[in-house]
Amino acid sequence: MKLVPSNCLNHSEKLLWTFVDGDFLYFIDSTYALYEYDLNNHKAYFIADMEAEILRRGEVSSIIKQKTDYFIGFKSSGLIQLKYMPDSKVKYSLQSINVQSGIFCLMKDRFQDIIWVGADGQGLYMYFTDEFSIDNIMLDVPEYRVDNPVRALYQDQDQTL
């Protein structure tokens, strides 16, 4: 087997962060613009200018899309949601989510409208997109004793957390 480099994106700017979710890539380029790239039709779609938020919060650790909204985790400064506003001139509204620590990973639950958030020092969060609430599963209680931050979430062969 041989790997051959390919430049299928043909994007003019340098990519700073790239994340994969199924048939889609989410990337932020050197102008701090967030794009969604469809691997099937090979088209990139501009989503939002993230410059002010990245300059304020720092390095991006994870990006996922849940329905029409984007969730962006920052390595040392929390989680934001780009909420789709179909009737607005600006299509996405930035909303801060109440997680005050670094975000290491985001994962969509395949059975429910839940986003699992692995946080630095605050354990594992469940963000319920329908109820607009967030809950923390503290990993320092005896049933879940974990002394380290949640840096990654894994699925088994049945695709369960």
Predicted ranges, named:
Residues 1-161:
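Carboxylate-rich, polar loop motifs that coordinate divalent cations or form catalytic acidic clusters
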